[in-house]
């Protein structure tokens, strides 16, 4: 049975869990130096005592607007920087401070950051970036979100996170993947290399699904094309490009599934003296600010990233609905100078 939470302190959690106050603090904040088994035991005690609920009650009682937590995979990635800009804009109009957490694309760091934000007394959390198709990660994320919402917190996500059951802004990744592949196929390309991130990311699975649909209309499958999974970064794009070119030197196009990877692809092609688009066409996905200023300017799929950030926080500021709300962020094909009709 839960204790009455008035006046509940960290020392109460520590005593009940049989640990020091310092250890309890580290466990609840997600800090290093505590084993996962011990941290989970302390969190279970805190949940049973209602300690998190007490933290939020004190925050609300202070009269201040609870802050906003924003979880991103990589703050240096222009995709997430644009999203953060939208979140900050809306937060500013509501007088709320934003705390940004960077996960370094590590799923377990993402779970720890969620926990840290809850214990930092934010009232809203926006999770930006792809959901993960990993049941263990999904289960841990869901547990943190449910605990937060059970004490009045609000959560919204950007991307497909079907296991969380929260309000979401979902980019049209399937449609975008289809559009960019159809563009290359329409230019006569059939020997297309694909530079992809991990298929354990829902974003990647969706973009590849769209590409697959376009290929199917031309009698091809993903298995017919060289596909390299690498980090969803510029360096990952370089790695993918090198492998594609080394193993399949006859490719006439490389389809990168985000703009960061596309920049890496362009870099490797430049190093090897491969003309773009004369020898190899290159495409990206997202349309980050720099995409239109590259040489050659990058053909890509535009997503309204800043608006996605705005919409996510706007959803989270609304009272919780009986069923999760979902908004779709539409895509637009941006044809620029990095693609051309296949030679011969």
Predicted features and spans:
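Short acidic/polar active-site loop segments enriched in Thr and Asp
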Residues: 20, 123, 189-191, 252
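Short helix-capping segments at alpha-helix termini
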Residues: 93-94, 151, 215-222, 246-250, ...
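Alpha-helical recognition/docking segments in bacterial nutrient-uptake
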Residues: 1-5, 63, 67-182, 186
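Hinge/beta->alpha junction and helix N-cap segments in small-molecule ligand-binding domains
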Residues: 73-82, 100-109, 131-136, 160, ...
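Flexible loop/turn connectors
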Residues: 242-243, 247-344
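Short acidic capping loops at alpha-helix termini that bridge into adjacent secondary structure
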Residues: 190-191, 222-226, 276-281
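N-terminal helix-turn-helix DNA-binding module of bacterial transcription factors
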Residues: 1-64, 208, 343
């Amino acid at each position: 049975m839960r204790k009455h939470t008035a006046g509940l302190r960290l020392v109460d959690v520590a005593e009940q869990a049989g640990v020091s106050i310092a250890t309890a603090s580290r466990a609840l904040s997600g800090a290093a130096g505590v084993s996962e088994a011990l941290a989970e035991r302390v969190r279970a005690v805190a949940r049973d005592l209602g300690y998190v609920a007490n933290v939020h009650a004190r925050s609300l009682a202070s009269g201040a607007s609870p802050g906003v937590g924003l979880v991103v995979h990589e703050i240096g990635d222009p995709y997430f920087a644009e999203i953060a800009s939208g979140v900050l804009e809306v937060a500013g109009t509501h007088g709320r401070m934003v705390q940004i957490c960077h996960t370094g694309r590590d799923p377990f760091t993402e779970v720890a950051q969620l926990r840290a934000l809850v214990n930092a007394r934010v009232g809203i959390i926006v999770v930006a970036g792809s959901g993960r198709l990993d049941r263990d990660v999904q289960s841990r994320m869901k547990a943190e979100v449910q605990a937060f919402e059970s004490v009045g917190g609000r959560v919204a996500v950007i991307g497909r996170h079907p296991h969380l059951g929260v309000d979401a802004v979902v980019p049209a990744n399937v449609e975008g993947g289809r559009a960019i592949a159809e563009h290359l196929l329409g230019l006569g390309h059939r020997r297309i290399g694909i530079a992809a991130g991990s298929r354990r990311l829902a974003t990647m699975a969706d973009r590849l699904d769209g590409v697959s649909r376009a290929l199917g209309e031309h009698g091809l499958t993903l298995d017919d094309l060289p596909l390299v999974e690498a980090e969803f970064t510029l360096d990952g794009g370089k790695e993918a490009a090198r492998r594609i070119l080394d193993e399949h030197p006859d490719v006439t196009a490389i389809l990168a599934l985000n703009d960061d990877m596309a920049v890496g692809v362009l870099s490797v092609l430049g190093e090897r003296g491969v003309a773009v688009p004369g020898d190899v066409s290159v495409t990206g996905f997202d349309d980050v600010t720099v995409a239109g200023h590259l040489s050659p300017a990058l053909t890509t799929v535009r997503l309204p990233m800043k608006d996605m950030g705005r919409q996510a926080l706007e959803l989270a500021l609304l009272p919780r609905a009986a069923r999760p709300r979902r908004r779709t962020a539409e895509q637009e094909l941006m044809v620029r100078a990095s693609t051309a009709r296949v030679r011969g």
